[in-house]
A protein has these predicted regions:
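Alpha-helical transmembrane segments in multi-pass membrane proteins
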Residues: 21, 25-26, 85-86, 121, ...
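Helix-coil boundary and interhelical linker segments in multi-pass alpha-helical membrane proteins
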Residues: 4-20, 63-81, 122-147
């Protein structure tokens, strides 16, 4: 691998590790720390929901902690703008989702929207040169832990919920057949 290829590879790799850290924070807040009662409150009250407020506070704390850990506070307000971008768009996407039915297309649109924002935030962070060299060194030294953590966090609860949403129409059809058999 030439020097240019290696440098392109390292930039890509750093981007992926930073994205994975933001993705872990997102998954923890969306799938592990969000209570069912908050979800039901969001569906019932939409943007006036206390559940939405609690959910957003969870994202504020986890995303903020992740960004602060990555960038630190070096006097730059750029991190604050990234934080506002992630939290603000998450809030808007979640409000939009409360007005939709809980079906696969809307579920996927919701999660893809969040992931696109995290990719954009990663891109902006990398190109801002706000991340200190010590952060890059740490990320590269602990890359395996970060990758495995992201895989475990994603494959446990988020994947189970995704499979449940995929299978919901089939389950409803099976339930309808069971009911029609019992009535006959």
């Amino acid at each position: 691998m030439s020097g240019d290829e290696q440098s392109i590879y390292m930039v890509y790799y750093k981007n992926m590790i930073i994205f994975l850290l933001l993705f872990i924070a997102h998954c923890l807040a969306d799938y592990y720390l969000q209570r069912h009662s908050w979800i039901m409150d969001k569906v019932a009250r939409h943007e006036r929901s206390v559940g939405l407020l609690y959910h957003m506070l969870t994202h504020v704390l986890l995303t903020g902690a992740t960004l602060f850990w990555l960038v630190g506070f070096n006097g730059s307000w750029f991190m604050l703008w990234i934080w506002i971008l992630i939290i603000g768009t998450h809030y808007l996407i979640d409000i939009w989702k409360t007005y939709q039915t809980f079906t696969l297309p809307y579920y996927l649109a919701d999660q893809i929207g969040h992931i696109v924002v995290l990719i954009l935030a990663t891109y902006l962070l990398i190109n801002s040169h706000a991340l200190p060299d010590s952060t890059y060194t740490f990320l590269l030294e602990h890359q395996a832990i970060i990758i495995w953590s992201a895989a475990l966090v994603f494959l446990a609860n988020p994947m189970a919920i995704t499979i449940m949403v995929i299978l919901m129409p089939l389950r409803e059809k099976m339930h309808q057949k069971d009911t029609s058999i019992a009535v006959s």
